[in-house]
């Protein structure tokens, strides 16, 4: 009797353990939520997509927890921008085989699309701060998920990796990629139409994140408060922005939900400029088939609501 109970317990344990292992392994892990938006569209109905960075946290200063490292180790596929953006992931991802990772910044179709970072506006930082800035961002703007063109290339790369890992799901993965590309084309048209009347309206953003989106849709930023949001803008930079606000050269200044807007509020105080919020991470959007398109539309609405004065 005891022997039968032992065998039954062992069988149940194996089944439960096997199921848990399968659930833990059957996942795409994306570094940041917008990267997860792209991945979840391609993996929809095939495997789970999870996001490493918690809502409300910033990719600029996050530290991995032991549970995060386990998630990376157990993932079927890890998708991230690269060490210039998610420095906190560099060590564990470097131990993963190439077949189990997509590094967006290193994709051959993405490299020609990379934009240079803008450092010139922050010359009043001291030398130590400047060095930290350059180390963190490198030569290029790494907010790559804000480019629909790069998002399209990322989706193709994720599709290719998942087909290699899960060839039995090729038909579904093919359909998902086709749907994503069609949605993206439609959203680009819709966003372009919404933002077209706003070309020529000047504004300041909190940090140098939005260049890809702004270039694609013809927006005209006057500048940013800081290149790296971990570093407070210097007094000279704040004075320059304040002067342009007083002279009514800008319609809006934009803060971000991941950082306290005190410095933005103080510079705008007493002027007629409007304040808005841009969320470069799509914090309130859930992963799903249409989440990347929702993200682009939300960002466009955030620009438009302030620039139009709605």
From Swiss-Prot:
Disulfide cysteine pairs (residue numbers): 252-306
Biological process, per Gene Ontology: cell adhesion; zinc ion import across plasma membrane; zinc ion transport
A single cellular component GO annotation: periplasmic space
Binding site for Zn(2+): 59-60, 143, 207
Induction behaviour: Maximally induced 30 minutes under zinc-limiting conditions, still induced in stationary phase.
Main location: periplasm
Keyword list, A-Z: Disulfide bond, Ion transport, Metal-binding, Periplasm, Signal, Transport, Zinc, Zinc transport
Classification via Pfam families: ZnuA (PF01297)
Signal sequence annotation: 1-26
InterPro entries, sorted: Bact_metal-bind_prot9 (IPR050492), Lipoprotein_PsaA-like (IPR006128), ZnuA (IPR035520), ZnuA-like (IPR006127)
Keyword presence, Transport: yes
Molecular function as annotated in GO: zinc ion binding
Compartments where located: Periplasm
Record bears the keyword 4Fe-4S: no
PANTHER family named in the record: HIGH-AFFINITY ZINC UPTAKE SYSTEM PROTEIN ZNUA, HIGH-AFFINITY ZINC UPTAKE SYSTEM PROTEIN ZNUA-RELATED
Family assignment from sequence similarity: Belongs to the bacterial solute-binding protein 9 family.
Its biological purpose: Part of the ATP-binding cassette (ABC) transport system ZnuABC involved in zinc import. Binds zinc with high affinity and specificity and delivers it to the membrane permease for translocation into the cytoplasm.
The protein, known as: High-affinity zinc uptake system protein ZnuA
Organism, as annotated: Escherichia coli (strain K12)
């Amino acid at each position: 009797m005891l022997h039968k109970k032992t065998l039954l317990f062992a069988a149940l344990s194996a089944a439960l353990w096997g199921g848990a292992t399968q659930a833990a392994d059957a996942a795409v892990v994306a570094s940041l939520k917008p990267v997860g938006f792209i991945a979840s569209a391609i993996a929809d109905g095939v495997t789970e997509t999870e996001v490493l960075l918690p809502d409300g946290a910033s990719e600029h200063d996050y530290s991995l927890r032991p549970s995060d490292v386990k998630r990376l180790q157990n993932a079927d596929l890890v998708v991230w921008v690269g060490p210039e953006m998610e420095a906190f992931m560099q060590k564990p991802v470097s131990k993963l085989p190439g077949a189990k990772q997509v590094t967006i910044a290193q994709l051959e179709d993405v490299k020609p699309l990379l934009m240079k970072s803008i450092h010139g506006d922050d010359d009043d930082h001291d030398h130590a701060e400047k060095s930290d800035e350059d180390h963190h961002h490198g030569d290029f703007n790494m907010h790559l998920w804000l480019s629909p063109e790069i998002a399209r290339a990322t989706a193709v790369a994720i599709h290719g990796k998942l087909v290699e890992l899960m060839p039995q799901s090729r038909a579904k993965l093919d359909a998902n990629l086709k749907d994503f590309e069609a949605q993206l084309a439609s959203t680009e048209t819709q966003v372009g139409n919404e933002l077209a009347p706003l070309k020529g309206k000047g504004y300041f953003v909190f940090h140098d994140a939005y260049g890809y989106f702004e270039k694609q849709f013809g927006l005209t930023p006057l500048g940013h408060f800081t290149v790296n949001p971990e570093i407070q803008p210097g007094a000279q930079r704040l004075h320059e922005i304040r002067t342009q606000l007083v002279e009514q050269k800008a319609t809006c200044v934009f803060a971000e939900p991941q950082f306290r807007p005190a410095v933005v509020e103080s510079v705008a105080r007493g002027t007629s400029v409007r304040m808005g919020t841009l969320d470069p991470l799509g914090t309130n959007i859930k992963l799903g088939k249409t989440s990347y398109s929702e993200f682009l539309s939300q960002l466009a609405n955030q620009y438009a609501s302030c620039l139009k004065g709605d």
